[in-house]
Amino acid sequence: MHSLQAKILDPRLGSDYPLPAYATAGSAGLDLRAMLQEELTLEPGQTALIPTGLAIHIADPGLAALVLPRSGLGHKHGIVLGNLVGLIDSDYQGELMISCWNRGQSTFRIAVGERIAQLVLVPVMQAHFQLVESFDESQRGAGGFGHSGSH
């Protein structure tokens, strides 16, 4: 298991509400909580920036973190991330904030301490451009947007 530096920015995290943890041995994501001062109401179409009460420093340029929606919130209530996926660079040290978007048809209430997103650590490979005049031919070429078939 990889070690990750973390700072608790909201004292309720770790006392009133559990620290992020893997739910099972096979879980890929750590749940992030809405560390709000009071319950928040999201009307259909509305977005809000939600604090997690947690800052991390990955420190390893070979790693990054992704903030992803929780499947149940999206499927059952239409609550997804406003930016669809959050990317946390290895050198970022600020608070993790969650952009929540109510794409559903009903008002949704986010309770203080509710699990609203998940954090997944992923490997990163940085690349540099090798500028060329043309590419070696591939079977696909420049075809896109359904070019490879529908089934």
Curated annotation (Swiss-Prot):
EC number in record: 3.6.1.23
Cofactor dependence: Mg(2+)
Pathway: Pyrimidine metabolism; dUMP biosynthesis; dUMP from dCTP (dUTP route): step 2/2
Enzyme kind, highest EC tier: hydrolase
Record-linked Pfam families: dUTPase
Keyword terms of this UniProt record: Hydrolase, Magnesium, Metal-binding, Nucleotide metabolism
Binding site for substrate: R70, S71, G72, N83, L87, I88, D89, M97
Family designation: Belongs to the dUTPase family.
Name listed for the protein in its UniProt record: Deoxyuridine 5'-triphosphate nucleotidohydrolase
Gene: dut
